[in-house]
């Protein structure tokens, strides 16, 4: 081992600072409003040493700029909530790592691949707090200690060596600089909306900038005596410590040309600090590669070996990752024709890119006397690769016919070699009326080599380096009656989150291309030949129980005579009456139901010349734009006391999540306004709506919170994981989606739905008819306990309601019983009015005092009241339970199941 070049003590990591950074007062990232979470204190380590060998100048105000920079790091950290051991990591190899809960997980629970919410990333500006830095992990995070870790330099070098971490810090000069890291898959979800790639759904926040400190790679290679090119030293390979499944089992590895590694202008370092602290586990602790201007995939984390070779890295991940193949090459062709091994398709340097971040997705700009008197400021970020400076960013409001040049903010100074390693920010003021008359906003950037972004997306099998114009769609909406605003839509939302104009367009394309049972040929025997045409305004008039029309795939159906027969109850139709419910219908109905619908078709929708209240309609084509603006009124804050709006979806924010057991979670969702109640009558349910795997998914749930909770509602949900139940190998779509939702994300809610409403003191409204009971036989199976629980909760909350409740609750195992603690508590405190009996298929616990098996006549006779004119049976559970256990056994007891059985 070589001797130390310097003999200095190193008992701690010094709080490193970057080269100078002085944010402009007019920076586009200023003034962004973002709520501050619980703060955590930033601890500045003592004896800070500043290294400025990479500065572009020797300005006297460097110290002031460095101090200002330290304050930026401190401010960023103070606005973060503490990182925690996330329950989603339980049962994985990463359960020891603390992470920020707001990070959006893109690949389920494990491995951890995530990006921050875009607005939160931009709130912090130039420097990203480490917990919000995007993460790309191919597998579990390797565990290692500072004292035991070594980095080996070997291969075509004169003196192969292993260096400890202390040697890397003490024996070499350090280099410290801000670098923007970008995953090559940034904006990949846009590509997946066109055609599925082999990669997961990165949004537009797979980009982050932090301050990195480490040893210049060239210094390590020089110490070891790297051979010359003539002696075969052509490539420098990097190998990490993570053991991965690719290629039958291998380490993550890649390589770069030796000329790059030895070029001082490229600032390549073996890094051990980030933002003045040791590396976080997800970012490569204790040491990793940083290669400015390159894609993140070349910057190997948890670096163990640096090998100088003649050939490129032979790692599976060097060839089967980070390539841009021609659009006609799919995964099968790439494998059969060995496209992976063609050197011309490898990705090294980043390409030019830009993104619109303000307006954010689903932001609504009210149009009123105040907003129209001042410009609206568009904002975003841009970057390029190879150290090239972004020289201009342009915005178009007319599809590229004309462009406006934005104001650029480059917070970094160039290095002494003239390189720019970081993102910059752009801003542009536009008139609100110009926005109102536009269909979309698009942005493109240029760098100093006059590279710019293509107009259209160019698909490739890995979905990498997507840099087409970033487009934000705009539509006129009506937040309140008689008032308008502009709602903005980004192309996608990251991961499996729903939303984005590309998802809507994809859904429409799939609907048009798929074989439609609703679009039958004229020769079809049961073809409804109705050809009458109706306008949207005419359809809207038919939104009541007296006349309920719906639109599905452009066809109009009169569902009035089907209201009473609909399995989901009258409300399920009425909530969509007078609207286009294509998405909702496709999401929850079978092909059989679609065929049945054909009997109710009365005509077709006129698709031109009508206006819709839907945000999906623009004001384009209006013959008199000024007349359209005439009725604009100043918007006022919403004063609604009830959140649910029939026929509309409302966005609700996930604010808390608790694990009750290994597969049961309690979710708390905030309502749109803090002073609202949900507005769900007791006995009814809501639909949760999300786009999962490019399709709208809607599932019914009953909240477990009381109806008068203000500002939020709660759900207790059993998670049906993939690969657990043989009959359902893919698990539950919505429950798994809920489990993967990060705090702070939104879910659409629609309701109220259902044909049963408990009105108090034993009174029910069922299909519009009154029913009364003094005693309730409540039979539930599995998650069907939630509507029963809701009714019980309402009864027990009213001191004047003396209704008696007899609960028989069936589950597969004891562990599957939901809300058991609450049910047992009620039965214990009020035994004269609440009686609870459990039935499980099998019991493995000693002391089980309840029934084992299935619900039988004997069990019901013993634990529910005899039928009478003041007794009603309530049931909710799987259809087989209702059909084979509830209905026949109640009939044997003498219940009139047509009149006295209410099935939720």
UniProtKB/Swiss-Prot annotation:
Biased composition (Polar residues): 1-10, 35-50
Coiled-coil residue spans: none
InterPro entries (UniProt xref): Cbr1-like_FAD-bd_dom (IPR008333), Cyt_B5-like_heme/steroid-bd (IPR001199), Cyt_B5-like_heme/steroid_sf (IPR036400), Cyt_B5_heme-BS (IPR018506), FAD-bd_FR_type (IPR017927), Flavoprot_Pyr_Nucl_cyt_Rdtase (IPR001709), FNR_nucleotide-bd (IPR039261), Ig_E-set (IPR014756)
Essential cofactor(s): FAD; heme; Mo-molybdopterin
Keywords: Disulfide bond, FAD, Flavoprotein, Heme, Iron, Metal-binding, Molybdenum, NAD, Nitrate assimilation, Oxidoreductase
Protein residues bound to FAD: 699-702, 716-721, 728, 733-735, 786
This protein's record includes keyword Ribosomal protein: no
Activity regulation (record text): Regulated by the nitrogen source and controlled by the circadian rhythm.
Domain FAD-binding FR-type: 647-759
EC number(s) from the headed UniProt entry: 1.7.1.1
UniProt cross-references to SMART domains, sorted A to Z: Cyt-b5
Binding site for heme: 566, 589
Domain of life: Eukaryota
Catalytic activity: nitrite + NAD(+) + H2O = nitrate + NADH + H(+)
Biased composition (Acidic residues): 56-65
Ligand binding (Mo-molybdopterin): 183
UniProt-listed Gene3D superfamilies: 2.60.40.650, Cytochrome b5-like heme/steroid binding domain (3.10.120.10), Nucleotide-binding domain of ferredoxin-NADP reductase (FNR) module (3.40.50.80), Oxidoreductase, molybdopterin-binding domain (3.90.420.10), Translation factors (2.40.30.10)
UniProt-annotated stretches for the region Disordered: 1-65
Molecular function terms, GO-annotated: FAD binding; heme binding; molybdenum ion binding; molybdopterin cofactor binding; nitrate reductase (NADH) activity; nitrate reductase (NADPH) activity
Top EC class, one word: oxidoreductase
Quaternary structure annotation from Swiss-Prot or TrEMBL: Homodimer.
Function: Nitrate reductase is a key enzyme involved in the first step of nitrate assimilation in plants, fungi and bacteria.
Entry's family note: Belongs to the nitrate reductase family.
Protein name: Nitrate reductase [NADH] 2
Classification lineage: Eukaryota, Viridiplantae, Streptophyta, Embryophyta, Tracheophyta
